[in-house]
Amino acid sequence: MATQTFTFLVTDIEGSTALAERLGNAWAGVLADYHRLIQGALATHGGQKVVSQGDGVFAVFASPRACVDAAIEAQRALLSHAWPAGEMVRVRMGIHYGEAAQTAAGLAGLEVHRAARIAAVASGGQVVVSDAAAGLLRDSLPAGVG
């Protein structure tokens, strides 16, 4: 099966189950706002959402720099958003660069799994970048990012 190279972005709300329990019926609105803010950053920087499930988003970009720019924009938007009941929605994000195969079910391959694992090690409000992606970014990171 033929593969393509992508820059992957995986996002996940930290502590989403506890947050959903605290917010009750307001949780649906939180999810809607979260997805809207993430989608806005994806659209601005040329990202393409592959799948979203619950509080997770998996997207791809043509370049690592566009992916980093989208992640930074999304984190800033999430941080400045007025969430209900004074809650803070903290999102962990992971960025990885690698190959994946397009299947009827979506993208598949070891690098897709690695991207998810990279996001899992992030803390809420943090973007973790794999060595594979970081190696392509060394000379093009935005000011203040390192």
Predicted features, each with a name:
Residues 39, 58-146:
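Catalytic beta-strand-to-alpha-helix segment of the class III nucleotidyl cyclase homology domain
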Residues 1-70, 76-77:
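Catalytic NTP-binding/metal-coordinating core of nucleotidyl cyclase/transferase enzymes
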